Amino acid sequence: MTSIILASGSSIRRDMLQNAGLDVEVQPARVDEASIKSAMLAEDAPPRDIADKLAELKSLRISQKNPEALVLGADQVLVHAKRLFDKPEDLSEAREHLELLSGQAHELLSAAVISENGKPVWRHIGRAQMIMRPLSAPFINAYLAAEREGVLETVGCYKLEGRGAQLFSRVQGDYFSVLGLPLLEILGFLRARGVLVE
């Protein structure tokens, strides 16, 4: 049976795959995301290309060490007003992000690349439009106090499957892509490859 490796340390991505019935091994890929993003932004690369490139590099890094496995690399970027957001470094930066995104729409792009034998064999980018409601200062204070360092784990300072749902008035697009993986498309590929029963 073909083994599946997740080239990510994300517990959310791991849980999504395992909850969908997949037996996955986790091997986080170490790539210099900041340098790659910076270089691509300097070349005016669109955000979708940045997410796709990071997912591909993670997938390839682990695939080269595990050529017989299907290796899934993933990356998510948040775009607002032509600005690419990174995960906040601390709670002060998380507050700034929430204040900037408050009452605004932003887009999440979740890229996934599967490699085998050191080559990409499948890729997909899921999209979601996130409409954040206007957030009051007391709400932001209470939210950050409740979520604490958990907001530093995600690019948008929220987990939609938890308290982060309170930030939004509307979400358009794929729910799983909001969580960080275009799960349904991944499952479709695995069925087509015979890894999952059709």
What are these regions (language model features)?
Residues 17, 55, 75, 94, ...:
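Residue-level signal for inorganic ion chemistry
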Residues 123-197:
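Active-site oxyanion/phosphate-handling segment shared across diverse enzymes
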Residues 79, 113-116, 133, 170:
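Short beta-strand-to-turn element immediately C-terminal to the catalytic PLP-Schiff-base lysine
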Residues 97-99, 110-123, 127-128:
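Anionic-ligand binding region
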Residues 23-34, 113-119, 153-165:
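Mobile beta-alpha loop/short-helix "lid" or hinge segments that flank ligand
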Residues 76-106, 132-134:
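Active-site-adjacent loop/tail segments of enzyme domains
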Residues 15, 83, 149-150:
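Non-catalytic structural scaffold of enzyme domains
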Residues 1-70, 138, 145, 184, ...:
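N-terminal polybasic phosphate/anion-binding patch
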